[in-house]
Amino acid sequence: MKDELFLRGENVPMTKEAVRALALSKLELHRASHLIDVGAGTGSVSIEAALQFPSLQVTAIERNPAALRLLDENRQRFACGNIDILPGEAPMTITGKADAVFMGGSGGHLTALIDWAMGHLHPGGRLVMTFILQENLHSALAHLAHIGACRMDCVQLQLSSLTPLGAGHYFKPNNPVFVIACQKEENHVRDI
């Protein structure tokens, strides 16, 4: 989905189109029934997932009041009745397990969020995270290795977009984004 389709607001983050496409692919939602989107922002990941997989139940968690309004407006705009919005900050209590968790940031609670996410995943469930800070990348990789996450991979995505400049065009660079994907092992016994 094009980024322009989503209602946006100042200081409300949105996972951009190319990053969103890669993250959704890494979540492997074709076999999922429940996705948790932590820090949903405008709802771009939740909405695209809900539209691609109409039988998927999506739980979108967001703490920012302005983002919550945009998230709800975007949910209505795309008629996504399969998205539940939970105001608040993860880690939080959620009933039931998920097949996939997406984290678009950590709010300074990275390892606690990883533990929380793994505790809310079914065995074999997927966790996908995106970061722009190298410190978060290194902390996440180290913690995932420590807790025994499997099928772990990481991609650095750096895109440039064709942009007009005077009478010509140039490729305007965007900041690199790190995308980490992993799986809760099938026989995982360390639930949080």
Curated annotation (Swiss-Prot):
S-S bridge residues: none
Superkingdom field: Bacteria
Entry GO MF terms: cobalt-precorrin-6B C5-methyltransferase activity; protein methyltransferase activity
Pfam families attached to this UniProt entry: MTS (PF05175)
Residue positions binding S-adenosyl-L-methionine: 15, 39-43, 62, 90
Keyword annotations of the record: Cobalamin biosynthesis, Methyltransferase, S-adenosyl-L-methionine, Transferase
Broad EC category: transferase
Catalysed transformations (reactions): Co-precorrin-6B + S-adenosyl-L-methionine = Co-precorrin-7 + S-adenosyl-L-homocysteine + CO2
Enzyme Commission (EC) number: 2.1.1.196
Coiled coil: none
Pathway: Cofactor biosynthesis; adenosylcobalamin biosynthesis; cob(II)yrinate a,c-diamide from sirohydrochlorin (anaerobic route): step 8/10
Family: Belongs to the methyltransferase superfamily. Bacterial-type CbiT family.
PANTHER family, alphabetized: COBALT-PRECORRIN-6B C(15)-METHYLTRANSFERASE (DECARBOXYLATING), COBALT-PRECORRIN-7 C(5)-METHYLTRANSFERASE
Protein name from the UniProt record: Cobalt-precorrin-6B C(15)-methyltransferase (decarboxylating)
Lineage: Bacteria, Pseudomonadati, Pseudomonadota, Gammaproteobacteria, Enterobacterales
Gene: cbiT
